[in-house]
Amino acid sequence: MANKKKVALACSECGSRNYTITENPNRTERLEVQKFCKYCGKHTLHRETK
């Protein structure tokens, strides 16, 4: 089985990369999820980055 690439989820407010996920080759657009940012101290929108 091929190695799966990991991508990071970055906070849209402070830019810190708090979460990592495995890349899904079937998904064409970038993932956007509401997650808790420990640096901002609140739930913010996190976007997929490379």
UniProtKB/Swiss-Prot annotation:
Cellular component, GO annotation: cytoplasm; ribonucleoprotein complex; ribosome
Keyword Transmembrane: no
One matching Pfam family: Ribosomal_L33
GO molecular function, one term: structural constituent of ribosome
GO BP of this protein: translation
The entry's keywords: Ribonucleoprotein, Ribosomal protein
InterPro entries: Ribosomal_bL33 (IPR001705), Ribosomal_bL33_sf (IPR038584), Ribosomal_zn-bd (IPR011332)
Family: Belongs to the bacterial ribosomal protein bL33 family.
Name listed for the protein in its UniProt record: Large ribosomal subunit protein bL33B
